[in-house]
Amino acid sequence: VMFASDGQPVEPGGGLYKRPVFVLRESFKPVLPVDLDMLAAATEQLQEAKDREAAVSLAEITIADPAAQADVHTDLLGRLDALAAVGLPTLVTDMGELFRVAGFLRRYATPRVVFVAGTQSFAALFDEKPFENLPGGVFEALGRLFTRGVTLALYPDRDPRTGEILRASTVAVP
């Protein structure tokens, strides 16, 4: 289900058709300024000004996470209201794997879909446990994710233990 920036339900094709889409998957408990900055910083990376104007920043909340299943319905409406209050369109999915979300969005958005992630989310992409049901495991999942214009924008973070800034080149992956 997709909600427009005013909180009203919309067809995904209407708001995403032939537009670059920047997707941030979070729980949004609560919506933080860094969430909005992550999307804004990723959008600024577009070369053409006309592409930046056409780009859609999209919050994605999955209800497929079994660990969060107990409280997902109790506060989902509050999170949707908070995202609408900051003017962020929202996609609510039951797709646990990002490659499934990418496939869904590629039906509507062109020329590209960009997933925006912090360093912890980036490292989680390489965790093999969620992909045990795929014959190719994590490699198959990554291959299915990064296809036909789907990319990842990594937002730097600070290591809580050392204070060092973590980037794609310095983050530890499993």
What are the residue ranges of the model-derived segments?
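Nucleotidyltransferase catalytic core that binds NTPs
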Residues: 1-174
